[in-house]
Amino acid sequence: MVREALQFLSRLRKSSNLPDPFTCNKHIHQLINSNCGILSLKFLAYLVSRGYTPHRSSFNSVVSFVCKLGQVKFAEDIVHSMPRFGCEPDVISYNSLIDGHCRNGDIRSASLVLESLRASHGFICKPDIVSFNSLFNGFSKMKMLDEVFVYMGVMLKCCSPNVVTYSTWIDTFCKSGELQLALKSFHSMKRDALSPNVVTFTCLIDGYCKAGDLEVAVSLYKEMRRVRMSLNVVTYTALIDGFCKKGEMQRAEEMYSRMVEDRVEPNSLVYTTIIDGFFQRGDSDNAMKFLAKMLNQGMRLDITAYGVIISGLCGNGKLKEATEIVEDMEKSDLVPDMVIFTTMMNAYFKSGRMKAAVNMYHKLIERGFEPDVVALSTMIDGIAKNGQLHEAIVYFCIEKANDVMYTVLIDALCKEGDFIEVERLFSKISEAGLVPDKFMYTSWIAGLCKQGNLVDAFKLKTRMVQEGLLLDLLAYTTLIYGLASKGLMVEARQVFDEMLNSGISPDSAVFDLLIRAYEKEGNMAAASDLLLDMQRRGLVTAVSDADCSKQCGNEVNCS
């Protein structure tokens, strides 16, 4: 096709005759469809320079191509120049511009193009359903729900929605978490005598799967089968992902089997989703079984698949296998990304292999990566937990530090009892424009309680409340522990009651803490009361019921 177009251009240069519009359009389309769009642009420019007046569709083909390249400003210049060559732009010309702006994420410019058509009152041309569908698609990608509602009303004054319109609305509503609106649009579509297609169903199924409402998703899937609609790989992927996220791996496998039976070829994303699902359930064997299936299909692992497998193996305590996968990845000429490097660092630290973790960090730098906040936080946390706090501080970077990194370092310093450095870091947080959060305060309070410095711990609690931060279960438990350790049981019980009044439900740990403290001071009645309260809440205690009853002299039935 390209050769034919080039031969035509060669003959044209030797001839004084200009081509007819049909021949010109044919060759421009051939060049664009053969990925020679730049050549088609030069071809059109040559014809114009010869005084030829191209047909509008020739310009439109080139405009569409230029927009898909992302060069929408250049495409606009072409559209605006069309009248100079005796050719008026039509709605197709402007639709390409709207679509181009939306592809670039420039929704405002896309809206302005459509509004210019409306404002012309048909003098230029009227927007059609494609104009609105392109704009709605742009809104959908940017999750601009309010704009969808505005332009719904505008569109209905010009034209009626079609299947594409409804599908786009449904997709937007699902992405915005408005599932009831999505389902309502689905039913409205049917009332308008429009039949939902595979895209419509898939958008809705994906929305319900992501919301965790699998039964509605499955009912839609069954409706698709009932009307004998062919499901595609995207539909199956949405369902499989929904089952995996819920941990329903048997149903995920059944859907995979149905997919194969329907002769829909599973792609890399399907396999990666199932592999991740099994790893999340702690089932490494089945995860590796599906990895073998994936490789037997002749699929090459991409960076995402490698990341899922490495993370899954590390999370299931299979560091040796994860290391082998990283080596296999590098042999395949794929460079691990920042996430994989950080995952491996974290796994090495957790297994006590600090040297290997630090080596992985240096390897990350050697590969040209600049450590991000997650990588630096992992380093600080890992080194500090391995008892080398001062070395960890070396990796602290004020320029990159966020609340997570500050929390990690403050927690480590508090465990070491270095409260002077903690105080200094708190001042740095404010200078950096960050606000200390409850996790930072809780770590500080815990450190002070551990040292028995209850006065400063409660001062910090007051400061925390003054800054509008609510204490959580961990903060209250820490304070109760500090008071109980000092034998201040009246005060400990007051903090416990304050926690209950604030609406926080106690866990087994805080009950056990108080019960043991009461037993230690011989207040068995108070211990028994707490044990009964704990049992009423359905919590399991490490304190023996029999011991409690015995020590109470059987005054209270604790069973």
Swiss-Prot record:
Keywords: Repeat. It holds the Pfam family PPR_2. PPR repeats lie at residues 20-54, 55-89, 90-120, 128-158, 162-196, 197-231, 232-266, 267-301, 302-336, 337-371, 372-396, 402-436, 437-471, 472-506, 507-541. Transmembrane segments: none annotated. SUPFAM superfamilies: TPR-like (SSF48452). InterPro entries: Pentatricopeptide_rpt, TPR-like_helical_dom_sf. PROSITE patterns: PPR. Belongs to the PPR family. P subfamily. PANTHER family: OS03G0856100 PROTEIN (PTHR47447), PENTACOTRIPEPTIDE-REPEAT REGION OF PRORP DOMAIN-CONTAINING PROTEIN (PTHR47447:SF28). NCBIfam families: PPR. This is Pentatricopeptide repeat-containing protein At2g01740. The lineage of its organism: Eukaryota, Viridiplantae, Streptophyta, Embryophyta, Tracheophyta.
